[in-house]
Amino acid sequence: MITCLRNWPLLLKRFSVHQIHQFTQLSGRFERPPQSGKSSRDPYLVTVVQGRSKKPRFPGERSNQRFGEDSWFVSSTPLAEVMGVADGVGGWRDLGVDAGRFAKELMSCCSGQTQLSDFDGRSPRNMLIAGFQELSHREHPVVGSSTACLATMHRKDCTLYTANLGDSGFLVVRNGRVLHRSVEQTHDFNTPYQLTVPPEDRKESYYCDKPEMAVSTRHSLLPGDLVLLATDGLFDNMPESMLLSILNGLKERGEHDLLVGASRVVEKARELSMNASFQSPFAIKARQHNVSYSGGGKPDDITLILSSVEVPNA
């Protein structure tokens, strides 16, 4: 059976990246946007987005809300702050498919759910289910597959709700320590759970995971907590201790300081991904699964959404 799982032998092959395209988008417009129904006392998120493509943009790629084959979105409603990341599965390139387009369209469909009148932000898994259903039932479906991680902060109870499918993920950092971290969902080494829309004439040849398989969690948040969403390009290359070291160096939690911190994280992860001698988390996992790998980082697209929980001044 042909599966839609990531083609990991391709990823294990070392290759040289001569040019890295960088696209940075400040997300200050997501900070305390004016919304009817939102109390001035409600907590809110200060959010920035940063990322790197592993290769220069190819013709036709839209850089907006994409870093290579990764995609992301950030949205705000009267009841919740919402964000998501998705990692398009690169194996589709062998079939001439833009692997990042599926991730982009999936995030667009999920983001669209936040505009519905009954959206309350407490079930990102339902948002993922509805978004994927919309994408897969289009008259002309977008072929491809992707991991997905969605998170919402509900304003009234200051609670983080998450849904994660695959090996993208999230962290909650409080007082310099990781309070919560998502768990990867994989079928085998470097073969994550993923949502898939196969070609119409080959549906029977593909095994596809379902959005209902996403792991849902909820976590109470406090002012000053950091919430981080990222694709595996970050987690496969940067140890948690190194990530914490950079985040703990933030002196303030304003938009500028968060952007500086996010940029440092992404740049360090990119540097490590190109280091052939670094014992990256990816290299360690390969060894644990008895997979032949020479060591070093894993060149990949990197997407990071970094948020700080804040409350209005009295």
Swiss-Prot record:
Binding site for Mn(2+) 2: D87, D232
Protein's GO biological process: positive regulation of ubiquinone biosynthetic process; regulation of ubiquinone biosynthetic process
Cellular component, GO annotation: mitochondrial matrix; mitochondrion
Keyword terms, alphabetized: Hydrolase, Magnesium, Manganese, Metal-binding, Protein phosphatase
GO terms for MF: metal ion binding; phosphoprotein phosphatase activity; protein serine/threonine phosphatase activity
PROSITE patterns: PPM_2
SMART domains referenced in this protein's UniProt entry, alphabetically: PP2C_SIG (SM00331), PP2Cc (SM00332)
InterPro entries for this protein: PPM-type-like_dom_sf, PPM-type_phosphatase-like_dom, PPTC7
Gene3D superfamilies with a match to the protein in the record: PPM-type phosphatase domain (3.60.40.10)
EC number: 3.1.3.16
Cofactor: Mg(2+); Mn(2+)
Domain PPM-type phosphatase residues, every copy: 43-309
Residues annotated as binding Mn(2+) 1: D87, G88
The reaction(s) this protein catalyses: O-phospho-L-seryl-[protein] + H2O = L-seryl-[protein] + phosphate; O-phospho-L-threonyl-[protein] + H2O = L-threonyl-[protein] + phosphate
PANTHER family reported for this sequence: PROTEIN PHOSPHATASE 2C (PTHR12320), PROTEIN PHOSPHATASE PTC7 HOMOLOG (PTHR12320:SF1)
Name under which the protein is recorded: Protein phosphatase PTC7 homolog fig
Organism listed in the record: Drosophila melanogaster
